[in-house]
From Swiss-Prot:
Function: Involved in DNA repair and RecF pathway recombination.
Keyword line: DNA damage, DNA recombination, DNA repair
Protein name (record): DNA repair protein RecO
Superkingdom as given in the UniProt entry: Bacteria
Similarity annotation: Belongs to the RecO family.
Alphabetized Pfam families for the sequence: RecO_C, RecO_N
One BP term from GO: DNA recombination
Taxonomic source organism: Porphyromonas gingivalis (strain ATCC 33277 / DSM 20709 / CIP 103683 / JCM 12257 / NCTC 11834 / 2561)
A cellular component term, taken from the record's GO annotations: bacterial nucleoid
InterPro entries: ARFGAP/RecO, DNA_rep/recomb_RecO_N, NA-bd_OB-fold, RecO, RecO_C
Length: 245
């Protein structure tokens, strides 16, 4: 079956001497894996395709999908838009690598989800186009991503003035520390109340130190880890932590 779809590059891994495997998130088919020629000797189109397989590149692809196969072939591909600033700017590129790694871990199903795809594509365009401080971009992305994933926590105190713990497993505030030992203590759970309002447009108003920003990120990732297991350790947050004061 031939499919035509927009698709976002998540990850590329070595497969054998002839091919690598590109993992893409497509608008029409969800997560799909494609064999990508590793050498231009396999034809001009193979060499051109290899150059397009870069994290968060959005492509328009024509691909051949065969039933009962996990690996497919891309017949044609072209960039939907040029993200030159993401490629050339170290800060944007580091954020892009984090987003790509995160999405690679959580987007696992070969099922179309157009709302989720459109949010991710919109976010990539924002990363390319925005000017000014970018330190909170990844936090805004992770908070907003909860909406299309259907993982929105209950961040209301329910009228209580008593400081409460946040239980990431249940996605709500609770009066005592959760038994699993990974609850967010009352003096830090206020971050969640604050950040539930964050967007790409207002994220510059959220002023955090490097340590506070990393703490919020760790709490967010742990929330995802509870709700989308299995969830291995991320490699890219340490890079982000060195970029922003």
């Amino acid at each position: 079956m031939i499919i035509v779809s927009r698709a976002i590059v998540l990850h590329n891994t070595a497969y054998n001497d002839s091919y690598s495997i590109a993992h893409l998130f497509s608008r029409e088919s969800g997560r799909v894996s494609y064999l990508i020629p590793r050498s231009s000797k396999r034809g001009k189109s193979g060499g051109s395709l290899r150059l397009l397989i870069s994290p968060l590149n959005e492509l328009e692809i024509t691909a051949e999908h065969k039933q009962h196969r996990d690996l497919h072939f891309i017949k044609e591909a072209k960039l939907c838009s040029l993200h030159g600033r993401i490629q050339s700017d170290p800060v944007r590129n580091s954020i892009a690598l984090f987003l790509a790694e995160f999405l690679y871990l959580i987007l696992r199903l070969p099922e179309a989800d157009t709302n989720l795809y459109d949010f991710v594509a919109f976010s990539i365009d924002k990363l390319e186009e925005m000017d000014g401080p970018m330190a909170n971009f990844h936090l805004a992305f992770l908070f907003r991503l909860l909406v299309p994933l259907g993982l929105i926590p209950d961040l209301q105190f329910g009228g209580s003035v008593i400081p409460r713990w946040f239980d990431p497993a249940d996605g709500r505030f609770v009066p005592n520390a959760p038994a699993h030992g990974r609850g967010i203590p009352p003096h830090q759970s206020t971050y969640l109340q604050l950040f539930r309002r964050i967007t790409f447009d207002n994220m510059k108003a959220f002023r955090l130190s490097r340590a506070e920003r990393r703490q919020v990120l760790d709490y967010l990732v742990d929330y995802y880890r509870f709700h989308l297991p299995p969830f291995p350790l991320l490699k890219t947050p340490d890079i982000l932590s060195t970029l922003f004061d």
